[in-house]
């Protein structure tokens, strides 16, 4: 919009649209799982950004993940190609990548393709299948570029996302300790710019990791302590702790009480996995740049606190210490 483009947002019927409030965006309700509903939707459009996916750790209807993430992706790209759209930017995820190198202390990149049988949970599995379907369509001529974001942090995290929930749990004093893992922290604004760079400079059928700074869990919690003034979580749990807690939560809350576990197994598996990534391809080929993790985490924490997500007792303890402004590098 800042470049003068007319923007149309295709939304799942009934989906929240608070992030679009006040923006000059035309919103249309479309069920992407039904190809017929997309007929004519892209007429007159030059570009398409496929940004959304079905996500969750405790799906009530696992088949709906496949319908949205796989069939929906196929339907959207098919309709866009049929309408003559010049370029499609498809948002995949680094969750489709193999992580064997991270065990040796090396970050994964776009060439580290996972084996589907090694991916845990409906989201990862359906995004993997969807990504390979998109690559197949690109090989057949669809003008698609793929962006693989890492862990997004920053403002406007209404739901919140799993990465945002880590920040929120810290703010509310719900992280008594941590497992020594690592992850890639990216500012959501940098990820948005990465999508625009993929539109402008990306090669058809090529995937680009857009990320930020690789940090350990201990570093992440230390940064949050520095920028908020809250005490750091210092207790270190063994690497097996998340999965043990997840299995107990699954059995008691999921199997016995038939409600969403507070610690879903998929979330537990992610919490015990090192997920570091190398975004050199996007930097070299697209000119992608990112800001430090401290800025992303500070803006995430500040937004949650300013919008009523943090309990009053903890808000009273906050003493903000913003990191020094620095341009993305």
Language model: regions and residue ranges:
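Conserved Rossmann-fold NAD(P)-dependent oxidoreductase catalytic core, especially the SDR/UDP-sugar
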Residues: 8, 63, 67-122, 145
